[in-house]
Amino acid sequence: MAIISFTNYKRGQTTGCMSAVMRYTMQDKKTEFEGQQLVTGINCQPESVYADFMTTKRLYHKTDGVLFYHMVQSFPKGEAVDPVTAHAAALKLAKYYEGYEVLVCTHTDREHIHSHFLICLLYTSPSP
């Protein structure tokens, strides 16, 4: 069974912090499985996720304070779940954030498979 946790940035969030976390979570060597990158953008594009989040923030005049939420869904070491199934479970969980921009990146480089969710703080509209 997966567990969910949220990452707290004790020194606060900056645009530099957000950009660094996005780069970390999308690393090819962490998200690759059988030639496929387990990276999905919901209401945003992975290739331009930083610009997408910042455009939304500027539009709503919310460019300071909490910039994003960072959630992690982890499966225990030895859990019989493959990376594709873990990513599908992560995408199903991300549907609960309908109307938000969400980046989902499933990491396969550890003994425990886990997915990172970077969620833009601002609700924009429901997905089509």
Q: Could you say what each language-model-derived stretch is?
A:
Residues 1-125:
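N-terminal nicking endonuclease/strand-transfer module with a His-rich metal-binding environment
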